[in-house]
């Protein structure tokens, strides 16, 4: 990720349309055979007056496998300071070295849909905020605040000092994720790397380690699925409290 920001290159119809709606698109590469399609014309209209290049095939310049005929060069998005994610209603997803950018994008999409207030990612040894992540996020990374930090354990300490409870997802924990009362408080859910789980240092910073209950004999869930379940459980718990009379 560039020091000045992320999201410089975006690919795919939904991701580029979201970047255009956010006013970030500076240049578009569009396949000639698709230029008159309604979805492409809509993107061009949303982008205002971008520099437009018509090409035979965008795949040779694309990072993603299926760019859907459109690639955009964009003004970068600036990360938010970590401290801006704390507060009374904080609901954060911290990614402990997630490596697959498609998982990163999928988690961002679920987090936004569940009303989470921000995401924390590592600048090192982790999936970049790349075109692949943006395509998987389908516009979510245009909206949800992202803090980019050098150390996840250090970030968790800072969040704790800011009054945020830290809940780590750990398949081996005997504590059930569903119904955790601290989800009504400022909280950050920590999702570990694919196939590895939480790092030792990240796990030590957690106030609670919790697992997703599963049927006997089933394998652990994908990181993005686990994150989605945690995000929507936070939403469910908070709504159940707000809907309680008195």
Give each language-model segment a name.
Residues 1-84, 243-246:
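N-terminal positively charged helical leader segments and presequences
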Residues 17, 22, 113, 132-140, ...:
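Structured adenosyl-cofactor binding patch, chiefly the S-adenosyl-L-methionine
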Residues 24, 51, 87-174:
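RNA substrate-binding interface of SAM-dependent RNA methyltransferases
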Residues 33-35, 56-58, 124-126, 194-196, ...:
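Short, acidic/turn-prone active-site loops that include or flank metal/cofactor-
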Residues 82-87, 158-160, 178-183:
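Short amphipathic alpha-helix with an adjacent loop that forms part of the alpha/beta core around
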Residues 102-106, 198, 223:
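Short glycine/serine/threonine-rich phosphate/pyrophosphate-binding segments
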Residues 167-222:
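Active-site/ligand-binding-proximal alpha/beta "capping" segment
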């Amino acid at each position: 990720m560039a020091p000045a920001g992320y999201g410089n290159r975006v690919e795919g119809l939904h991701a580029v349309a979201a970047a255009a709606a956010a006013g970030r698109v500076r240049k578009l590469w569009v396949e000639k055979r698709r230029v008159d399609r309604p979805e492409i014309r809509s993107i061009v209209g949303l982008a205002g007056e971008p520099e437009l290049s018509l090409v035979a095939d965008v795949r040779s310049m694309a990072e993603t496998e299926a760019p859907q005929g459109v690639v955009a060069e964009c003004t970068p998005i600036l990360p938010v300071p970590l401290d801006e994610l704390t507060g009374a209603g904080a609901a954060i997803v911290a990614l402990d070295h997630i490596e697959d950018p498609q998982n990163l994008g999928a988690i961002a999409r679920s987090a936004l849909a569940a009303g989470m207030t921000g995401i924390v990612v590592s600048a090192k040894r982790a999936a970049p905020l790349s075109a692949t992540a943006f395509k998987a996020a389908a516009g979510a990374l245009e909206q949800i605040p992202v803090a980019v930090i050098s150390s996840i354990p250090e970030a968790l300490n800072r969040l704790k000092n800011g009054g945020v409870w830290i809940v780590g997802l750990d398949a081996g924990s005997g504590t059930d994720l569903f119904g955790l009362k601290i989800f009504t408080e400022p909280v950050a859910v920590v999702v570990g790397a694919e196939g590895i789980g939480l790092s030792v240092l990240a796990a030590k910073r957690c106030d609670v380690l919790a697992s997703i209950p599963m049927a006997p004999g089933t394998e652990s869930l994908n990181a993005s699925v686990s994150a989605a379940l945690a995000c929507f459980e936070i939403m469910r718990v908070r709504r159940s409290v707000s809907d309680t009379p008195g």
